[in-house]
């Protein structure tokens, strides 16, 4: 079918480092991707899959060991409610605007989209925040209260700066 061919074309176009983001209009009762297409996408270099819809074969996909975020699991095929018609275009997934080239960062708590135009700035601030948090964690492990350390107060900034050297 036309939809199946479009889906194949999209998956076969995956390149190293791609995150597949699927706008499924929050529909939870039709799988957007199953284990075979997920396996193929990861083999081609995809580093994650995100959909605001459902996945099929979620146990098998989880065993692939790659980051996958989805609203639901459902055994029915995507053709029941979805028809892929384009790729590499701006979409809205789970209410978030996503453009090709945006940076997507995820962990066990979820995923965030960073617009490509500000990705370098956000990365620099995130690195600085991680450094401040490392200081806070070290101090709290040593028995201190987080007050003034997290978030870092002006009174504790000299301690942080000495620790940073």
What is each PLM-predicted segment?
Residues 1-100, 114-147, 151-165:
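Feature captures the catalytic cores and cofactor-binding loops of soluble hydro-lyases/lyases
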Residues 109-112:
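Channel- or pocket-lining gating/hinge segments that regulate access to a cavity or pore
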Residues 104:
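C-terminal binding/interaction regions
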